Amino acid sequence: LGVEMDIFSSEKSIIEKGFLNKVLKILKDNKLIYEGILEKPKGKADLDEWEPRPQLLFKSSLFGDDSDRALKKSDGSWTYFANDMAYHLYKIEKTKGNLINILGADHLGYLKRIESAVKALSSNKIKLVNKVCAIVHLMNDDKKIKMSKRSGNFIMLSDLINDLGKDVI
């Protein structure tokens, strides 16, 4: 496809380098986190067991997001979003220009919150460009192939290019 990756980073190494702690310090220093209670999510019929609880929240609504966002789960571990903020701070510190995210269409609801995070972490100095890709279903013998990074069931892009050609991709 003509795209070269020159930096590979793992979430674990970014957290180990202290970027989550840096995020929390930036947010605290700028009074952008607080202990609060989120409203019950709308449109979720299966949330009968949902209970309001105090949690650490990022004031993402100040930056155009629909609501403030939780940084910790009920079990005390960090949310995916908190770790993603650490990753974006890492990218902010590495770049001299704008950031580009390429996300699947299943992440559309995530765009505003991560844009808010980049604005807050960069003091509005870095622009985040989000590109969204369609979800593609691969078929084998008229059956949809279910892929998952977490389960280890996936097809490498290089294999698809070898089988189909890069123009199809």
Specify the residue positions occupied by each region the protein language model found.
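Alpha-helical recognition segments enriched in aromatics with Gly/Pro capping
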Residues: 1-169
